[in-house]
Amino acid sequence: MSVSVHETRKSRSSTGSMNISVFHKASHPDCVLAHLNTLRKHCMFTDVTLWAGDRAFPCHRAVLAASSRYFEAMFSHGLRESRDDTVNFQDNLHPEVLELLLDFAYSSRIVINEENAESLLEAGDMLQFHDVRDAAAEFLEKNLSPSNCLGMMVLSDAHQCRRLYEFSCRMSLVHFETVRQSEDFNSLSRDTLLDLISRDELETEDERVVFEAILQWVKHDLEQRKAHLPLLLRNVRLALLPSDCLKNAVSGEALLMADECTKLILDEAFRCKTKILLNDGVVTSPFARPRKAGHTLLILGGQTFMCDKIYQVDHKAKEIIPKADLPSPRKEFSASAIGCKVYVTGGRGSENGVSKDVWVYDTVHEEWSKAAPMLIARFGHGSAELENCLYVVGGHTSLAGIFPASPSVSLKQVEKYDPGDNKWTMVAPMRDGVSNAAVVSAKLKLFVFGGTSIHRDMVSKVQCFDPSENRWTIKAECPQPWRYTAAAVLGSQIFIMGGDTEYTAASAYRFDCETNQWTRIGDMTAKRMSCHAVASGNKLYVVGGYFGTQRCKTLDCYDPTSDTWNCITTVPYSLIPTAFVSTWKHLPA
C-alpha cells in the first residue's frame, strides 16, 4: 500500500493569503524504477543494447548512467558507444553476472552467494557498481577461511577492496604456517608475499617457518624469482633463527651463496646474532625484531594508583605473575618498550613531586638501571617507540621546569630519546598541547589521539608527527572528544578504547592511519576510563581502568577477525594496572 503526504502551508503577502499544497509520495521512486524494469523486459523505449558472450540485454541509457559512473562516462564523453546503439563486452563479462548487475540497476536488489560473489566483486569494480562491489566484498569477509584467505588477498588487492584485503591478510597472518603449504601461496606476487612476511603480526614464534616459506616460494619458479630473494630475505628476522639453523643455511643452501647481495645480508645477520649472544649493547637491527606473537606482555601496577611492581601476563595459561619491584614507586608516569627493555618515564612520586627520571627494566636479565633524565619533568604524558627511539609527548610539568608552566597547562613539547647514545633531544612541538592522550606509533609516524587541552577541555583531534620532516599535522577529527583512552596498533590499524564519559567508556574504534578513516567496532565488555592496551599476535589486550566507583578487574582480548571481546582472566584485586607494555622475549640462541 502506498503512502502519500499532503502538506498545507499558508503564504501571506500584501494582497492577502494563499494556500499551497505540497504532495509527496514516498513510494514514487520505487514505482518508477519498477515500471522502468517492466519497460526494459518488454524492450519498450530502450535505446542501447549490451552484449556479453552471445546474450543481448536491451536497456535505457539513463538508467545505466544513473547507476554507474562507468556508463555515465561512456555515454557522455563523446566515445563511440555514446553514438552506437550497442555495447559489446564480448567474453570479458559473464552474461549471468551482467544480468545480475542490470537487475540491481532496475530494482536496487541483488542476491549474492558463494557461486557469484567473486564475479560480482570483479564486475562491480569494472563497471563501477561500487555498492555491489562492496556488498560482495562484505559477503566474502564473512566467508573467509584459511583455505581461501590468500586468494581473497589477491582479489581484493586487484579491486581496491581495502577492508577485505586487511581481513584476508590478517587471517593469512594468523594461519601462516598453514597457508604457506597451499598452492595459492606459491602463486602470490612478490609484493603480496612481502606484505605478509614484513608484518610484525605474522603469527609464529619460530622464524624458521618464514625463512623456509620464502625459499619455497622462490624455488617454485626459480629463474623468474631468484632476483627477489635479497629483498625477501631482508624481511626475515634472520637473527632470531637458531644459530645452527643460520649456519646450516649458509653451508647447505647453494641458492643463498649464489648471490653476492644475499651473502652480504647473511653476514649482517651473523654479526647481529653474535651481538645478541654476547649481550653486546642495544640490538636495534630489523633482523632481531621479534614478531608480536613472540612478545611478552607486562603490566605495571600496585595496590594503589602508586605503581610499585611489574607483572608478566601469560595469556595462554591465563595467569598474571609478579616479576619485579620498581626502584622508585610513582604514579601518572608513562611506560614503553624498546626491544627487551621497558622505559618508565616521569610521573609523580610519593610526595607528588614531578620527576624527570627514566628507569629502565631489562626483561632478559631482570635488572633495573637509570637512563639519562628527560629535559622536562612530566606527568600525565604519553610515550611510544618509533624506529628504536623513545618519544615522550605532552603531559603536565611543575612551575620549576626548564620550560615553566603551571600544573594546569598541557605541554606541547616533545622529547626524543636515543638509547644508543643515552641522550634526549627536543623535536618539533605538537600543534596543540595535550595531556592524558593516547599515544602510539604506526607506519613510521607518531599518532596522538584526543587528550586534555590547555583549557582543560577534551580534544577531538588526531595529531601526527613525521620524524623524517620533523613536523606535526592534524590528520583527522576523532568521532568525539576523548581523554583517558587506550590505543594499540595492528599494522596500519590503530584501535582506540575507553574514555571518561558515559558514551565513550565502553566504546572502541578502528582508525586506518593510511586513509585516516574511522570505523566503530564492537563495544568492550565493560566501561573503562584510564585503561591500557597492547597488541600481541593479531589480537588486542586491554586491562585496568575504572568507571565511577567500579574498577575493571578483567584482562580482555579483542579478536578483529570476529569483532568480539572475551575475558582472558581476572586481575588480582590487589593489582591496579597503571601501564601495559609489550616487550621482546629472550632471543633464541
Swiss-Prot record:
Function, in words: Substrate-specific adapter of a BCR (BTB-CUL3-RBX1) E3 ubiquitin ligase complex involved in various processes, such as translation homeostasis and lipid synthesis. The BCR(KLHL25) ubiquitin ligase complex acts by mediating ubiquitination of hypophosphorylated EIF4EBP1 (4E-BP1): ubiquitination and subsequent degradation of hypophosphorylated EIF4EBP1 (4E-BP1) probably serves as a homeostatic mechanism to maintain translation and prevent eIF4E inhibition when eIF4E levels are low. The BCR(KLHL25) complex does not target EIF4EBP1 (4E-BP1) when it is hyperphosphorylated or associated with eIF4E.
**Under the GO molecular function aspect, what terms does this record hold?**
ubiquitin-like ligase-substrate adaptor activity
Pathway(s) where this gene product acts: Protein modification; protein ubiquitination
Alphabetized, the UniProt keywords read: Kelch repeat, Repeat, Translation regulation, Ubl conjugation pathway
InterPro entries given in the database record: BACK (IPR011705), BTB-kelch_protein (IPR017096), BTB/POZ_dom (IPR000210), Kelch-typ_b-propeller (IPR015915), Kelch_1 (IPR006652), KLHL25_BTB_POZ_dom (IPR030565), SKP1/BTB/POZ_sf (IPR011333)
Upper classification of the organism = Eukaryota, Metazoa, Chordata, Craniata, Vertebrata
One Gene Ontology biological process: positive regulation of fatty acid oxidation
According to the UniProt record, one GO cellular component term is:
Cul3-RING ubiquitin ligase complex
Q: Tell me the subunit arrangement.
A: Component of the BCR(KLHL25) E3 ubiquitin ligase complex, at least composed of CUL3, KLHL25 and RBX1.
Name the chain's protein: Kelch-like protein 25
Which species?
Mus musculus (Mouse)
- Start and end of every BACK domain? 149-250
Q: Where are the Kelch repeats?
A: 296-340, 341-388, 389-444, 446-492, 493-538, 539-585
Output the CDD domains linked to this UniProt entry: BTB_POZ_KLHL25
PANTHER family annotated for this entry?
KELCH PROTEIN (PTHR24412), KELCH-LIKE PROTEIN 25 (PTHR24412:SF487)
- Domain BTB, by residue range, is 46-114
